[in-house]
A protein has these predicted regions:
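Glycine-rich FAD pyrophosphate-binding loop
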Residues: 2-24
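Central helical "cap/lid" subdomain
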Residues: 18, 177-225
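Dinucleotide-binding Rossmann-like beta1-alpha1 core, especially the glycine-rich loop
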Residues: 27-115, 266-271
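Helix-loop-beta segment of a Rossmann-like dinucleotide-binding subdomain
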Residues: 64-77, 100-153, 245-249, 304-311
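Flavin-binding catalytic cores
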Residues: 95-98, 201, 205, 222-223, ...
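Helical element adjacent to the flavin cofactor pocket in flavoenzyme catalytic cores
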Residues: 124, 128-186, 194
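Mid-domain catalytic core of redox enzymes
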Residues: 218-258
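C-terminal catalytic lobe of FAD-dependent flavoproteins
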Residues: 271-352
Length: 352
């Protein structure tokens, strides 16, 4: 928005927990996103198509290396049952792509091993799905670069501000944080797990829930695994990240031995040589999920000029959020098929 000449203040609260923007896996992903919502499939595809230019521009502006790689991504299967389930999933996703641009295929174990010549696959590996549109990025560098670009172009960053109250009167919003007051004619709520509470203050119902994911990180080693997966990826520095756990419920970001053990065991079943690496770090972070795990984009009917945005795919969709959503908010240019992302889909009576 600052690139379009808007005067923007970013209010960020105090949060000592590891949030999704800092604790994520860094995937720029298509193949597993959008089941049951064709518009979301196309949204993710368009976002990945915009990512190379988005990354290049951000690196040139800020000097941060995002380490963005669009190598394609894998989902590796263990056993025939997982393999068949994946076949069914990919077929359903392919049929859901209205444009026919969803590019994902199943590959055999032999083909998979030929793609990974420097590391041996486990005996139970039965094949994988491969999506040429997938890739990965260093998430902390992305966050730093976006914050840097925002401030370089005139944006004002106000950290350690917890919004306590939002009022709307005479086409103007007043935001109170306890230490400061802010006024604006347009308000964008992108508050992660606080979105539900904040959106209610301006007449919007946006349900979000936390889901904990835990991650293990190994020591650095030579690059041998060139394709990211949702469970295993090798970072630019050579360390491996292992993850993909899902625990719904509370706001606890602690790790648990049982879950970390399960993550490690599955990773070793896929890549047995990982057992030779030392584990050096682990963490838990909270995903921000709507009931169907799809995005919500909404303008308030009660308080025009207030918008709510929430998505589990913040990294994957960063390229499209910084372009098309800006046009929606500043220029009222509503993207085609945007009603699919309205939260009325969670209310059966309203959706009919």
């Amino acid at each position: 928005m600052v690139k379009k000449g808007a005067k923007v203040i970013l209010i960020d609260r105090v949060d000592n927990r590891l949030t999704a923007s800092r604790g994520n896996f860094g995937l720029v992903w298509v193949q597993g996103k959008g089941k049951g919502m064709p518009r979301y499939v196309e949204w993710c595809i368009e976002a990945t198509e915009r990512w190379p230019e988005f990354a290049e521009n951000l690196e040139n502006e800020t000097g941060f290396n995002l380490n963005y790689e669009k190598t394609g991504g894998l989902e590796i299967c263990l056993g025939e049952e997982e393999h068949q389930e994946r076949i069914n999933f990919i077929e359903e996703m392919s049929q859901a792509s209205n444009s026919g641009r969803y590019d994902c295929e199943m590959i055999s174990k032999k083909k998979l091993q030929s793609m990974l010549p420097k590391i041996k696959l486990g005996k139970e590996v039965s094949g994988a799905s491969f999506c040429s549109q997938d890739g990965c990025v260093t998430p902390l560098n992305l966050l730093k670069a976006m914050n840097s670009s925002f401030q370089q172009k005139g944006g004002t960053y106000r950290p350690e501000q917890t919004v306590q109250k939002i009022e709307f009167s005479s086409n103007e919003f007043k935001i109170e944080t306890g230490t400061h007051n802010f006024k604006t004619e347009k308000l964008v709520i992108a508050g992660g797990l606080m979105t539900t509470k904040l959106a209610k203050m301006v007449g919007m119902e946006v349900p979000v829930i936390p889901e904990r994911g835990q991650i293990l990180v190994t020591e650095r080693t030579s690059r041998v695994f060139n394709y990211p997966t949702a469970e295993i990826r090798q970072n630019y520095d050579g360390s491996f990240m292992l993850g993909s756990s899902h625990e719904a419920g509370d706001y606890d970001t602690d790790t648990s031995y049982e879950v970390l053990q399960k993550i490690a065991k599955r990773a070793i079943r896929i890549l047995p040589n990982l057992k030779n690496l030392q584990l050096i770090r682990s963490w838990g972070a909270l995903r921000v999920l709507t009931p169907d795990q799809k995005p919500v984009y909404l303008e308030s009917d009660q308080c025009p000029g207030a918008y709510a945005i929430t998505s589990h795919s913040g990294v994957s969709l960063a390229s499209i959020h910084s372009s098309i959503l800006v046009e929606w908010i500043l220029e009222e240019r509503i993207p085609p098929g945007f009603t699919a992302f309205h939260p009325k889909r969670f209310n059966v009576q309203e959706a009919i």
